[in-house]
From Swiss-Prot:
Name of this chain's protein: Histidinol-phosphate aminotransferase
Source organism of the structure: Wolinella succinogenes (strain ATCC 29543 / DSM 1740 / CCUG 13145 / JCM 31913 / LMG 7466 / NCTC 11488 / FDC 602W)
BP GO annotations: L-histidine biosynthetic process
Keyword Cell inner membrane: no
Gene3D superfamilies to which the protein is assigned, alphabetical: Aspartate Aminotransferase, domain 1, Type I PLP-dependent aspartate aminotransferase-like (Major domain)
GO molecular function: histidinol-phosphate transaminase activity; pyridoxal phosphate binding
Known pathway: Amino-acid biosynthesis; L-histidine biosynthesis; L-histidine from 5-phospho-alpha-D-ribose 1-diphosphate: step 7/9
Keywords assigned: Amino-acid biosynthesis, Aminotransferase, Histidine biosynthesis, Pyridoxal phosphate, Transferase
Documented EC number(s): 2.6.1.9
PANTHER family, sorted: HISTIDINOL-PHOSPHATE AMINOTRANSFERASE (PTHR43643:SF3), HISTIDINOL-PHOSPHATE AMINOTRANSFERASE 2 (PTHR43643)
Uppermost EC category: transferase
Length: 367
């Protein structure tokens, strides 16, 4: 059977390995598997959110409010915008998909960092767009500008902070750069980890209202999957000028999040204090990873997220290292598929991190 030939250039995205796979393949009990691969909040959603989900389960047979009025109002209030500035998706990556399909076609170009969120590439290839990448792994706006001037792409992707590396540009540096961008270029600012960046350094904070007022051709993406602890609920959002939102709404399928997901996100917005406590604990534990790396003579990228990337260089092979850890019940993310000999580790709970240090040290001491 023949399919769209543009699919030939697309690699199937591989998410972080699930706990269930480790149980099946290695016979390890679920309670002995530690998953530090998918950048989930290890503390989960707040107890009040869990309670709200449980109560809402009796309505699982009902479609959700497709207007998502209450959630849009909550997000509008949080960011000081109007509900017509908000669109909801099944994760922020669904809004990425909407944006690329709404803006691009086979004659379009998109620009992104060499090493960044893989779905930018996937969605762009789906429409046949030409993909432009900077030469450096991390975001360097001088490189973006050099390519932008020559190519004038239809979409510019900025991942702030950047996944899978963890670095983050200062807000003013970003704004100075965006002043030079044409109105016809859609600037997608992916803020999936913005709650972490803003907590660690206020100079990294991107205010969605400020962004879209200064740069009307931009869209800010956020998610409930990371800091809010709702990865399994799959809820993300976009904030942009109404004209952009209206275009994206034409790409949205009806009822694109579930009744339970909608309720969870609405309640999660009320739990800012809980979320902040988990973020504080995240950076407390991250310091332990930085100290471990320094003690082992391993480079790392200073992170503004809930994960840390260890650059292994010639010390050990990241594929062999991550596989060895996997066989012992520790799931981390191997970055070899990005062309980097590195592993990305989600910051877990204290006891999970203890076990991670123990296993990594055991492996590294062999070399």
């Amino acid at each position: 059977m023949q399919f769209n030939p543009t699919l030939d250039s697309i690699k199937t995205y591989e998410a972080g390995k699930p706990i269930e796979l480790v149980v099946r393949e290695y016979g390890i009990k679920p309670q002995n598997v530690i998953k530090l691969a998918s950048n989930e909040n290890p503390f989960g959603a707040s107890p009040k959110v869990i309670e709200a989900i449980a109560k809402e389960a009796v309505n699982a047979h009902r479609y959700p409010d497709d207007s998502m009025f209450e959630l849009k109002e909550g997000l509008a209030g949080r960011f000081g915008v109007k509900s017509e500035n908000v669109i909801i998706g099944s994760g922020s990556d669904q809004i990425l998909e909407m944006a690329v399909h709404a803006k691009c076609n086979a004659s379009s170009k998109v620009l992104m960092s060499k090493t960044t969120f893989a779905m930018y590439d996937v969605y762009s290839r789906q429409v046949g767009a030409r993909i432009l990448r900077t030469p450096s792994d991390q975001h360097h706006l001088g490189e973006f500008w050099e390519i932008y001037q020559k190519e004038r792409p239809e979409i510019l992707f900025l991942c702030l902070p950047n996944n899978p590396l963890g670095e983050c540009l200062d807000r003013e540096e970003v704004y100075d750069f965006l002043q030079k961008i044409d109105d016809e270029t859609l600037v997608i600012v992916d803020g999936a980890y913005q709650e972490y960046a803003a907590f660690k350094d206020s100079q990294k904070r991107i205010d969605p209202k400020d962004l879209i007022e200064r740069f009307p051709s931009s869209i800010f993406l956020g998610t409930f999957s990371k800091a809010f602890g709702l990865g399994g609920m799959r809820v993300g959002y976009g904030i942009a000028q109404p004209s952009i939102i209206q275009a994206l709404m034409k790409m949205r399928a009806p009822f694109n999040i579930t009744t339970l997901s909608l309720k969870a996100a609405i309640e999660a917005l009320k739990e800012s204090a809980y979320v902040e406590e988990t973020i504080k604990e995240n950076f407390k534990e991250m310091r332990r990873y930085e100290e471990f790396a320094l003690a082992q003579g391993i480079d790392f990228i200073p992170s503004y997220t809930n994960f840390i990337t260890l650059l292994l260089k010639n010390r050990v092979d990241s594929s062999e290292f991550s596989q060895w850890l996997l066989e012992r019940g520790l799931i981390v993310r191997n970055l070899k598929s990005y062309g980097i000999n590195a592993i990305r580790i989600t910051i877990g709970r204290s006891l999970e991190n203890d076990r991670c240090f123990e296993l990594m040290q055991e492996y590294l001491h062999q070399f």
